[in-house]
Amino acid sequence: MTRAGSSSALPDLDGSGLRIAIIGARFNDHIVTNLRDGALRGLERLNVADGDILESWVPGAFELPLAAKALAETGKVDAIICLGTVIRGDTPHFDYVCNEAARGIQDAQLATGIPVMFGVLTVNTEQQALDRSGPG
């Protein structure tokens, strides 16, 4: 279903009429803002109307699952995109946050039946996060 000359291997998708939430983690917000901008560009390419996009922010990646589950339970959205960045430090904190964010996001979609996308970068350095969050 790829058009001739298209660089995308995705089938033709149309998000018209879908209500999509983007939940971003404020920690490392300069990187998460790049991810948000990319998500908005992608939704625009899929014909999701600006008025059908709900944006919300939480303190960090650890809080994404609770916000996603609460929002999914309202029935006001068809899908949720969770965005965050966790950069490895010198303590095990990185592992705890990454593991619980991933598990919690998965649990939120399984509990509610609403798709919840895991858009959390888990990287070793800020430069890796910047490289992975820019336009592409």
Regions found by a protein language model. Name each.
Residues 1-6:
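Short gly/ser/thr-rich secondary-structure transition/capping motifs
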Residues 94-95, 99-136:
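C-terminal binding/interaction regions
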Residues 56-74, 119-126:
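Glycine-rich oxoanion-binding loops at beta->alpha junctions
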Residues 63-105:
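Glycine-rich phosphate-binding loop
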Residues 29, 44-49, 69-76, 106-110, ...:
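Generic secondary-structure signature for well-ordered alpha-helical cores
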Residues 29, 33, 37, 58-62, ...:
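Electropositive phosphate-/nucleotide-binding environments in soluble metabolic enzymes
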Residues 10-59:
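Glycine-rich phosphate/diphosphate-binding loop of Rossmann-like nucleotide-binding domains
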Residues 24, 82-86, 115-122:
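Short beta-strand segments
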